[in-house]
Amino acid sequence: MASLQTPVMVGTVVGCVAGVVGFLAMSSNAATSLSVAPASTSTQIIANPSVIAPQYQGSVTSEDVAMEASQTDFAEVAEISSPVQVQSWSMIFSAMLAVPLAAAAMFFMKKSTTEERRPLVSIDDLLSVGKKAVVASAVVGAAAGSANAYPIFAQQAYGNPREATGRIVCANCHLASKPTEIEVPQAVLPDQVFEAVTKVPFSGPSGFFNVVDPSTVVGSVTFAGTQPVGFIQESGVPVSQALVDIATPGTPDTVFKATIKVPYDESLKQVAGNGRAAPLNVGAVLILPEGFRLAPPERIPEKMKEEINGLQFIQYSKDTPNILVVGPVPGKKYAEMTVALLSPDPRVDKKAEFGTLPIYVGGNRGRGQLYPTGEKSNNNIYNVEHSGKIADIQLNEKKRIYTVAVQQKDGEIINEDLPAGAELIVKVGDVVEAGQAISTNPNVGGFGQAESEIVLQNPGRVQAFLFFSFTVLATQTLLVVKKKQYEQVQLSEMNF
């Protein structure tokens, strides 16, 4: 029987260590946090509604934001138990060690010689399988990262996501406008769970980068999971989603739920921060009336827990339990998001009040066009900065970046680098003017907001109304009976 040589044994041991380290990198990411912002983030909060792109200072830089975007935009890998996950030091060191250990294992294995005699199981086959396993474990371990939530940008810059003008601040970075709808029960009782349906239809053509010409207007095709739902068409083009029926509210002593639906065409892809095509993320912000909040876990029925599907909404801040955010989360898994809510009892909570109350909702799909620092993301049309003739176009395939050389009238050539993933609509020899768009619009997402009303009924008023209705009914019944008696008396007197 063939004996394994020393390099092979060393390579095997190192490969096993790499696999264990890769596994640790994955398992160390299991811990989650519901904190508003990571403890390592230092931010000076500026909440000025008049500023379109909020500027804040601290450890969060544009490079950090770009790096975060490139990691987060791949929504399908975000198999998370809560929207916000915090990286641990053990995960970082494990991920850093996994790849070099795998490389060392392959180096030792490469030094092994081929044995002529083969046992029942070929050593070459074992080495081939071992190499593949080592590489796979190292790659998985190094790629294991957390899914950071974009709402943290708004949480750091604004104390309240709804400005004095009524606009939700998500629109500061998500510049494209998309429709959003919400349906809520007409009325609920105190200490009751109800259902609100928010629909965020998606519009855009299909394709690898889903390029959208600025002048093209397309309709909205909506999906619930993988099944298309009803929509309204105009000249054969779907333009809006039809209303979806919702269930009636539960009994007065139960928790109610809010179901936020974000349907969109799952074949659409967005441009990630690194220029690659990635699935779309979805997110939402729900601004409830004062006193409304997330339902306690012990009040949530088992059936509703199944509908929630492990998704956890978080408070916008510790002082605003009535404002909830979620996302970005994978659209394929969370095309329909359910959250359990609890209505307040104004007799106990003095901040709450009976009557007709407003509910505001904002929903987005895809990435934004601006970072919180005010810088543009690569999810934009690129406008050339200089006038002249395009002398040369170079493509960095690794970074997916085009470099366009513009020759000005004086002969000077200026190179302009386009954002990663941009698709050119010009060619060498074209004459361009400063500010002219030279790339397609890669944005297939957008943000929309809507509002509705809900009535928090006073049980005393309901009881009084029922008592009044019963009294009126009884009075009318007695009057009819008395009238019959009077008629009988009249008939008896006429007989005499």
UniProtKB/Swiss-Prot annotation:
Its main location: plastid. GO terms for cellular component: chloroplast; chloroplast thylakoid membrane; photosystem I; photosystem II. Residues 1-149 form a transit peptide. It is a single-pass membrane protein. It is found in: Plastid, Chloroplast thylakoid membrane. The chain crosses the membrane at residues 462-481. Binds 1 heme group covalently. Its cofactor is heme. PROSITE patterns: CYTF (PS51010). InterPro entries: Cyt-f_TM (IPR024058), Cyt_f (IPR002325), Cyt_f_lg_dom (IPR024094), Cyt_f_lg_dom_sf (IPR036826), Rudment_hybrid_motif (IPR011054). It comes from the Eukaryota. Translocates protons across the thylakoid membrane and transfers electrons from photosystem II to photosystem I. It receives electrons from the Rieske iron-sulfur protein and passes them to plastocyanin. Belongs to the cytochrome f family. This is Cytochrome f, chloroplastic. The gene is petA.
